[in-house]
Amino acid sequence: MAQAQLPLDTPLSLPEHPKAWKWYDYFTFNVDHKVIGIQYLVTAFIFYLIGGLMAVAMRTELATADSDFLDPNLYNAFLTNHGTIMIFLWVVPAAIGGFGNYLVPLMIGARDMAFPRLNALAFWLNPPAGALLLASFLFGGAQAGWTSYPPLSTITATTAQSMWILAIILVGTSSILGSVNFIVTIWKMKVPSMRWNQLPLFCWAMLATSLLALVSTPVLAAGLILLLFDINFGTSFYKPDAGGNVVIYQHLFWFYSHPAVYLMILPIFGIMSEVIPVHARKPIFGYQAIAYSSLAICCVGLFVWVHHMFTSGTPPWMRMFFTISTLIVAVPTGVKIFSWVATLWGGKIRLNSAMLFAIGLMSMFVLGGLSGVTLGTAPVDIHVHDTYYVVAHFHYVLFGGSVFGLYAGIYHWFPKMTGRLLDERLGILHFVLTLIGTNWTFLPMHELGLKGMPRRVAMYDPQFEPVNLICTIGAFVLAFSIIPFLINIIWSWNKGKIAGDNPWGGLTLEWTTSSPPLIENWEVLPVVTKGPYDYGIERRQESTDEDHDEQE
């Protein structure tokens, strides 16, 4: 994509860049987009471990029907905060804040984000939010689920519930600030030689994500502020006995929280569109279709939220409308899946760790999408609403989708961030354990849901015990899968093989600078002369010319 193809030879030692950041700079209040990106990733991963420990504790409780491993109130608090942490403090910050901050300026040829100080502020709102969330356990912990529906959220552990609300508002503010920054950066700061049809697909995904967050997040903030007033100041926005309406809260909550699924998956789709062509050594199939499908998901995704409320007294016409809109939003997603499959077809695929997680994502997301189609239709959803069928669905989509994609991105861009390669043997072990653990844990939950086991309960009918025990064993396998990943990260960051500037032979602009990049990314800004996914085009052109010469 730049003027000159970078060599793929690997140096013997990591070069010293006088203008590169040192390790201790990552612990400071820094405005450089790369430092902030790493800070997002590391902080989010710490919360991922905390949320994962809560999940293991809950699965241990659910291993048997009469277990007393967790106090019921503590189980409810773990349930609430596990979901909250995994969504608001792991996937969203890692995908948008982590990869978005690190990669977008590098991919468009900018020296930093448009508003560096605003960028730093957006990150530094996250650690206090997480601390506030964890501190709520000193007051019993929020126990109303990650949805925090009233009236339950207004009568249980009200101090902890208020802390939960304030934490989410802080994270939402961070999201809004970051969205403004990404939109301005992509729109105004790409190098003059880069046309819109040369913009990397990850940047298209980040643009769509930012637009969606900017529209939906303030609605959640408004709904939570009203809930905070009901809890602490005697208002009655959601109190039916005083003229309020709890269904209004559901509308406000889901208007953000279903688009939040796309906030978590759109950047991951962008990562997929970068990883697959590089490691398949083929141009991406359907560049424009993938770019426009991100914008289509952004638009249609704002009109599907009521499928979470089919059992909340919604009228038939509303059920019909939102069933149709839910099925329509699957179309642009299908465009991406088929484009990735077409890109893989006939490619020279390198089955390294990044590519394995990308392919794993495709299989997991398709499985989750199939159950999503059934949940999007009102007649089926009414029967399996609030059962483990729903739990299985969203874990296949969000863990099998988002987390697999985050792992693919880490294995792909770790050499750029650190200058060193991750160990492939540990990476493949990590992938195998994660794939087995994911299916072992969540696939049996479909059976639990179809047989009627409700979600969010610590005690259940003994008939469900054998399947729950299977799920719990799978959860431990999934938990242990993180160990080789952590060993790989820590060891490779210090002792890993030197990567060189472009170990994968990538054509997007981040591969034209040093690894790790300079403080201002480049000594001289790059010039774009070809597309970001023109892999093998020159060889095919040479082959065509030779065939033409032979015919003559």
Swiss-Prot record:
One of its GO terms (cellular component) is plasma membrane. It catalyses: 4 Fe(II)-[cytochrome c] + O2 + 8 H(+)(in) = 4 Fe(III)-[cytochrome c] + 2 H2O + 4 H(+)(out). Its main location: membrane. It comes from Thermostichus vulcanus. Keywords: Cell membrane, Copper, Electron transport, Heme, Iron, Membrane, Metal-binding, Respiratory chain, Translocase, Transmembrane, Transmembrane helix, Transport. GO terms for biological process: electron transport coupled proton transport; oxidative phosphorylation; respiratory electron transport chain. Its EC number is 7.1.1.9. GO terms for molecular function: cytochrome-c oxidase activity; heme binding; metal ion binding. It is found in: Cell membrane. PROSITE patterns: COX1 (PS50855), COX1_CUB (PS00077). Heme a3 binds at H393. The chain crosses the membrane at residues 35-55, 85-105, 120-140, 164-184, 211-231, 252-272, 284-304, 321-341, 355-375, 390-410, 426-446, 470-490. Binds 1 copper B ion per subunit. There is a cross-link at H258-Y262 (1'-histidyl-3'-tyrosine (His-Tyr)). Cytochrome c oxidase is the component of the respiratory chain that catalyzes the reduction of oxygen to water. Subunits 1-3 form the functional core of the enzyme complex. CO I is the catalytic subunit of the enzyme. Electrons originating in cytochrome c are transferred via the copper A center of subunit 2 and heme A of subunit 1 to the bimetallic center formed by heme A3 and copper B. It comes from the Bacteria. Cu cation binds at H258, Y262, H307, H308. Pathway: Energy metabolism; oxidative phosphorylation. Its cofactor is Cu(2+); heme. It holds the Pfam family COX1. It is an enzyme of class 7 (translocase). This is Cytochrome c oxidase subunit 1.
